[in-house]
Structures are given as structure tokens and as C-alpha cells.
Amino acid sequence: MPKLGMQPIRRRQLIQATLETIDDVGLADATIARIAKRAGVSAGIISHYFGGKDGLLESAMRQILWDLGDAVARRRAQGVESPREHIRAIIDGNFDRSQVNKTVMKTWLAFWSVSMHRPDLQRLQRVNDRWLYSNLCHHFRRCLPRPEAQQAARGLAAMIDGLWLRGALAPQGIDVDRARQLAYDYVEEQLARSTSHAPTDA
């Protein structure tokens, strides 16, 4: 986490420079010097506030995850009420422009790779995974018995990640509309079971 005292606008500037540098040259070659040059600051500023490239990557990912949460919250704020609407808001947030632009997608891929060797980044990834699963499970649980709600949530979380990953690796980029529709179709298949099953407890 960056130290206190940095102005939010400067912090965002450095994070954006990090994302763009990773996009241009990859994580391995995204040196502090390159990031600092792109941001128009000294390398010492980055080292002082972030402790180096690893700290800057962690802060960049925290910002991306904050943007993801905000994308979901904005959709929920539009008056969604039913389980279907809440689940769709989560799907839409995960395929929001803030999560599917080329620069952010490359940073996500770099983060996943590095997090396998960094316990602190692994924790950040687990927090995100748990947030997605628990939110999906909560709303499926409003329609389905617990075991089926849990299974539906696991399946949809895996589908969201899989659709996102295939899109990130596709030469032509991600087809957001198609990805969303595939996820919507899965939700409808799961919710169709609610006509013959009711939740067993709150």
C-alpha cells in the first residue's frame, strides 16, 4: 500500500503509468525507471511511496478491484431488486469497460502470474474470488436450496473468469456482448430450477 501523504491525483497518475507500461513492454520490462518516465516523476518518488515495483503493482491491482466493485455498485444503484437483477449486475460489472480494456486485461494477466509466487498478492486474489462467489451465492440462495445455490455460484464464477480469460487471450479481443449473454443464459438455466425447488432456510 502507498504511504500516506501522496495526493490521490498523483497516485492515480502513477498507477495509470504502471498499467500503460505493462501494456507496452510487459511486467518483466516495466521497470521503475520506465514507469517514472511515463508518469513524469522521479524513480525516487515511486520507491518512497510504494516501496518499488511490487508495491506499485499491488496498488494498481487494488485500484482495478476497487473499479470492479464500483462498476457493480453503480449497476445495483439503478434500482435492482430481484436475484436475477443482482446477479446480472455482478456479471455486467465484471465485463465493465474498466475491466475489459486492453491495458487492464494485460495487468490482470500479469497479476495472476506473479500472485502464484507472492503470498500478499495471493491474498488479494483470494479476497476477490471470495467476494465474487459469496455475492453470487447469496443471490442464488434466494431462489435455490443451499447446495444448488453454491454449485450455481461456483459455476458462474468459473464461467465469468473463463469468458474473461478467453477474451483477454483472443487476438481480436473480448466480445463483451457475447460473453455477457453466455453468462446470462447460464443464470437462466440455474434459476429455472427455482420453479420446482424452494430455499430450505434463510
From Swiss-Prot:
SUPFAM superfamilies: Homeodomain-like, Tetracyclin repressor-like, C-terminal domain. Pathway: Amine and polyamine biosynthesis; betaine biosynthesis via choline pathway [regulation]. Keywords: DNA-binding, Repressor, Transcription, Transcription regulation. It comes from the Bacteria. Residues 8-68 form the HTH tetR-type domain. GO terms for molecular function: DNA-binding transcription factor activity; transcription cis-regulatory region binding. InterPro entries: BetI_C (IPR039538), DNA-bd_HTH_TetR-type_CS (IPR023772), Homeodomain-like_sf (IPR009057), HTH-type_TetR-like_transc_reg (IPR050109), HTH_TetR (IPR001647), Tet_transcr_reg_TetR-rel_C_sf (IPR036271), Tscrpt_rep_BetI (IPR017757). Residues 31-50 bind DNA. One of its GO terms (biological process) is glycine betaine biosynthetic process from choline. HAMAP family: HTH_type_BetI (MF_00768). Repressor involved in the biosynthesis of the osmoprotectant glycine betaine. It represses transcription of the choline transporter BetT and the genes of BetAB involved in the synthesis of glycine betaine. This is HTH-type transcriptional regulator BetI 1. The lineage of its organism: Bacteria, Pseudomonadati, Pseudomonadota, Gammaproteobacteria, Oceanospirillales.
